[in-house]
């Protein structure tokens, strides 16, 4: 598969098409892209919230209430893959488009003045990535300081949707934080976490491959959270499990192989940007996947 650094979300594909050769995909340098990025979320964790966690947990947004558009308050909520499900007091379970209109209220500390404030997040629409897909897309809106609902995911090319992922990432290192059963990230489609789900690396099934993908999308060679790419840089992506397979007519030079901690090997003459300032020493790549990497990237041959 060839991939390209673009800001807009990739085309929606059917689950059957998610496995196989594709021409162009998006890769970029942002780990996630929500309007929350200007906030310090309870100190140091970015984008994570807990569906049923204790308040004032320190590492996550405090979810204070979850109310359905029709169906009343939620007593229990969880993710099934990327689908949010919620149970009300009568025991009825809601999911998919039934959650349109639901509002989540939570507390956070605003970076601007260190004041703890209540914020509200609304589910404006819910669709599948494609008919029959197990990937769900959420149009999420956050109410701003003057009471206007604004898109949560507002990328360079305009608002986009989010994919809900049952994990939390450290915004500095890009590492996936140790699993917490009820932790959720609203991953915008135009940034690495969401893109990798769309590429077929579903973290509820392929956690290590998904984390590996978030490294390679951002050219985070050393696994330290520092990206070495820009938008609109084309790359080729392939793995050995058949999620992304070589495009038959693609001509490319191997850039690197990757695991969840960054690159396992790197061909310095084939990096996406010329002579990047890399803080680690990596061996050159030999035969395909001899380095122990899970996914391989390449750049178009000159």
Each language-model region and where it sits:
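Repetitive, compositionally biased segments used for assembly/scaffolding
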Residues: 7-302
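C-terminal motif of bacterial Sec signal peptides marking the signal peptidase cleavage site
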Residues: 2-3
């Amino acid at each position: 598969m060839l991939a390209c650094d673009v800001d807009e979300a990739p085309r929606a594909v059917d689950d059957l098409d998610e496995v196989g050769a594709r021409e162009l995909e998006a890769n970029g340098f942002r780990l996630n892209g929500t309007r929350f990025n200007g906030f310090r979320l309870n100190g140091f964790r970015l984008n994570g919230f807990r569906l049923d966690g204790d308040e004032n947990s320190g590492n996550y947004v405090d979810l204070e209430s979850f109310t359905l558009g029709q169906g009343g308050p939620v007593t229990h909520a969880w993710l099934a893959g990327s689908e949010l499900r919620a149970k009300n007091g009568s025991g009825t379970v809601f999911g998919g488009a039934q959650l349109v209109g639901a509002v989540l209220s939570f507390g956070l500390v605003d970076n601007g003045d260190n004041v703890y404030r209540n914020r509200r997040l609304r589910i404006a629409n819910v669709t599948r990535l494609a008919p029959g897909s197990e990937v769900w897309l959420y149009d999420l809106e956050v109410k701003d300081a003057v009471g206007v609902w604004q898109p949560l995911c507002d990328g360079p090319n305009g608002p986009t949707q989010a994919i809900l992922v049952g994990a939390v990432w450290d915004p500095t290192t890009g590492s996936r934080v140790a699993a917490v059963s009820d932790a959720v990230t609203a991953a915008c489609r135009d940034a690495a976490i969401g893109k990798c789900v769309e590429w077929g690396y579903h973290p509820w099934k392929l956690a290590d491959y998904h984390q590996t993908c978030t490294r390679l999308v951002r050219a985070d060679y050393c696994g330290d959270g520092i990206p070495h790419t820009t938008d609109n840089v084309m790359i080729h992506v392939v793995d050995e499990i058949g999620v992304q397979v070589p495009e038959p007519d693609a001509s490319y030079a191997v850039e690197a192989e990757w695991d969840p901690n960054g690159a396992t090997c790197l061909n310095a003459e084939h990096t996406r940007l010329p002579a990047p300032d890399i803080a680690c020493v990596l061996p050159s790549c030999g035969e395909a996947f001899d380095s122990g990497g899970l996914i391989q990237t390449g750049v178009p041959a000159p």
